[in-house]
Amino acid sequence: MSISSGSFAQPAAVVSSPGVTVPEPVASTPTMAELLQQPVYKARWQKMVKGQKNLPAWARKGAGTSGPYENITWGAQQYKVGSLCKPHDCSNNFMWVAFSNDKKHVWGLRVTVADKPEALDNPSKFATYQWLGRPNENIQAMLTAQLEKDPNWR
């Protein structure tokens, strides 16, 4: 087994000394921003944001700072869920995004926190929310739960 890197084949594992094998690197999960640039996901995203009002450019394009998405199960359904934020302003402008496992639906919860010193200690009291993609109560609960898992969200 080999892994192709450019035009050179790489060994799947590296032997560093007799009897010791170093495992091959595990491919990392793409970030939410990378997922949103894949054709199927990008098309769904563009359809979702098309009629949304008051949506900033970074959110409309799905281009922001993000970490790897997670595959989660919620209510017996599977979703790809992750966050995306405005570059250089993640604490005040971010969103949680969920794609259905069949890639046919996407929903979002955009959060804007007022730029006030008091918001640092208790951002939820200074937040406004915008639902994207018309999520039902179950999807709203899932996205809200993702937001509330953040230890900095008080």
Swiss-Prot record:
For whether the record's keyword set contains Zinc, the answer is: no
InterPro entries xref list:
Inhibitor_vert_lysozyme_sf, Inhibitor_vertebrate_lysozyme
Where on the tree of life does the source sit, at the highest rank? Bacteria
Signal peptide range? 1-21
User: Record's GO cellular component, any one?
Assistant: periplasmic space
Where found in the cell?
A: Periplasm
Keyword flag Nucleotide-binding: no
Annotated keywords: Periplasm, Signal
Q: Which family does it belong to?
A: Belongs to the ivy family.
Report what the protein is called: Uncharacterized protein YPO2857/y1376/YP_2723
The record lists the organism as Yersinia pestis
Q: What does UniProt list as this organism's lineage? A: Bacteria, Pseudomonadati, Pseudomonadota, Gammaproteobacteria, Enterobacterales
